[in-house]
Amino acid sequence: MSGHNILTQLESIDVLDLPYVERDLNFAQLVSLSFLLYGDEHSTATYILQKLLVLARATASDWPHSDILSQYAKSKPQTWRKYLVEALCIIGARQVLRKLGLCWQELRMHYLPHVGSIRVHIHPLLKSLYTICEELTLAQRGRMVLDIKEKNSVGDPLRFYDAEYLEIFLLDWLTRRLIRLGDFNANGSDVQLLIEYFKFNDLHAQATLLVDTVNAYATSSCSPATPNVLLPMDGNGIANESSSPTAAASRPRAKNALQLSRENAGIALIINQQEFYRDANDDYKVYLPPIELPLRNGTDMDKQRLTNVFSMLGYKVEAHDNLDHLSMLHHIRQACKRSLLHESLVVCILSHGFEDAVYGANSVALRISDIENVLCSYENLYEKPKLVVIQACQQEDKENNALPYKINASTKSPCQYLNMLRAMSTVPGFPALRHTQTGSWFIQSLCDAIVEHSNSDHIADILTIVINNVANKRGNKNETMVPWTGGALRQHVYFPRTSATDKVVPDSPGL
């Protein structure tokens, strides 16, 4: 459905439909809907908060007398329909949308309700906060409410205690200005209170969502009193002046560590495999899997994010799409040869794969350990950090019986493997998860961690943060994933420092 057709169907929704819409919602849905619609209207948020508190104490028979949605339509006579429908999509009220004559699948493709940081009409921070409410367990919500109320008691306390409806507490904090949404693009926003709480309690995914939302939409601060500066966190997850970008640059790093420079950081080679075909050369038939490899939608988001982040660090990024196995090997060898005057080398491969192997675009796989042998065989990379990042499934290939193409790369001493480091999207034997619109969990989390922690933490610690963040994620069907790292670093290695003026591009530009 095109955007024009959606707008046409929205006009068919009448204000007289709203009481029936409200009756079809349960209390939890009504709370979420009220939060999304009224959260950025400070003048009416207090009134709606009181209405919700009354409904929470009332019996179900009193609900037909609720007019929250009708009041909203009166407050926005020209635009209420598009806000309401997007909010209904976000909370997943499919039955209500069907009764309004709308198609859920078409609305889902238009509004992307499953992508927390992307919105069409609803305030971006409200959508992100709702997503967080859905992600937290009841126990996590309860601890959050108690902790924030204890440390930020302002005025009369909210006489409501059911943390299941976390949006009610968020509305209360908005009306007390403990958090601020800023304008429609989050300029002048201040959600640092929540970010600090999430970081301190190891809820890194939730903190990252808020940071990315502000970075994606805000362009400047509305006023000096309500800046939208999001401070990095110190080692304990506490944000303060000493952890600002400027201060982080002067914070002492570990002694006897290898610190890479922006001027000579090196090459970041990105091999992005999205489209696959079966090589027709008879010599390669033995290496082909029995079935065609599918399109890897979403991988361009990973490529773009890696390009942005490593460019920010000073690396010379070289990104290539859809390379066959020999072209992959050629570009890897060329990067090694041109690393004589560089301090490190990064190779990122985004593809399909199986255990210890990644596919070329021609469906011929290379063994990952052989790729590492290539990197370690070049004298001009001896003892230099060599980071291989792999986003690919690593399941055992019991059914396909595909063979990796053999690479000739010889090493003469175990010392050649010093400072070799591999970062895998998943532990051996398991698939790697990738969102078809926003990219993979692993690559996006890796880039987030580098942006946030590279000034203060060495590479091995950054990868540990990534493992924790990804392990805490859950898919729509409760899917899980655990990244894996391994290597032979002989000392701590730090990425080049970045300054506050370095531009960090958000996760999902252009969607």
Swiss-Prot record:
Cysteine pairings via disulfide bonds: none
Catalytic activity reported: Strict requirement for Asp at position P1 and has a preferred cleavage sequence of (Leu/Asp/Val)-Glu-Thr-Asp-|-(Gly/Ser/Ala)
Propeptide residue interval(s): 1-242, 406-415
SUPFAM superfamilies: Caspase-like
Cellular-component GO terms for this entry: cytoplasm
Localization: Cytoplasm
Active-site residues, as the UniProt record annotates them: 352, 393
InterPro entries cross-referenced by the UniProt entry: Caspase-like_dom_sf (IPR029030), Caspase-related_regulators (IPR052039), Dredd_2nd (IPR056260), Dredd_N (IPR056259), Pept_C14_caspase (IPR011600), Pept_C14_p10 (IPR002138), Pept_C14_p20 (IPR001309), Pept_C14A (IPR015917)
SMART domains: CASc (SM00115)
Record-level Gene Ontology MF annotations: cysteine-type endopeptidase activator activity involved in apoptotic process; cysteine-type endopeptidase activity
EC assignment: 3.4.22.61
The keyword Protease belongs to this UniProt entry's keyword annotation: yes
Entry keywords, A to Z: Apoptosis, Cytoplasm, Hydrolase, Immunity, Innate immunity, Protease, Thiol protease, Zymogen
A Pfam family assignment: Dredd_2nd
Enzyme type, top EC level: hydrolase
GO biological process, one term: innate immune response
Signal peptide: none
Keyword Protease set for record: yes
Family: Belongs to the peptidase C14A family.
Function of the protein: Effector of the programmed cell death (PCD) activators rpr, grim and W. May play an apoptotic role in the germline as well as soma. Role in immune response, required to resist Gram-negative bacterial infections by regulating DptA. Fadd interacts with Dredd, Fadd promotes cleavage of Dredd and is necessary and sufficient for enhancing Dredd-induced apoptosis.
Assembly and oligomerization: Heterotetramer that consists of two anti-parallel arranged heterodimers, each one formed by a 15 kDa (caspase-8 subunit p15) and a 10 kDa (caspase-8 subunit p10) subunit. Interacts with the N-terminus of Fadd.
Protein name, per record: Caspase-8
Organism listed in the record: Drosophila pseudoobscura pseudoobscura (Fruit fly)
